[in-house]
Amino acid sequence: MSDTDTKHWIATVPFADLARRRRTRVEVGDRALALFLVGDRVFAFDDVCIHKGRSLSRGVVWQGRVVCPAHQWAFDPETGRAEGRDECQPVHDVRVVDGVVHVDPRPRSQEEI
């Protein structure tokens, strides 16, 4: 089964918009997601931080990590793992097709990461 068969891709925002702002919040079904541009790659997290419940989309990318604005926990954009902690922020698969960012609204399982 191919990647396109197992994922539920939802179009969100034009890549050009994300490239200008470097981060944004999107609603995908009943989930709020935070999209970040780290280098030339797009990453998606659940927007609500696992620690204090703040919006990650208001955070920043610093040294290749997504940093929460509430408490400065730094998350690995690939895995969602909080630096120096055992907790993981839920992450989502992302692709860019024809200049539009698509995400799978279902978080990846830890086994997939």
Label each region the model flagged.
Residues A74:
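Short helix-to-coil "ATP-lid" hinge immediately C-terminal to the conserved N-box Asn in the Bergerat
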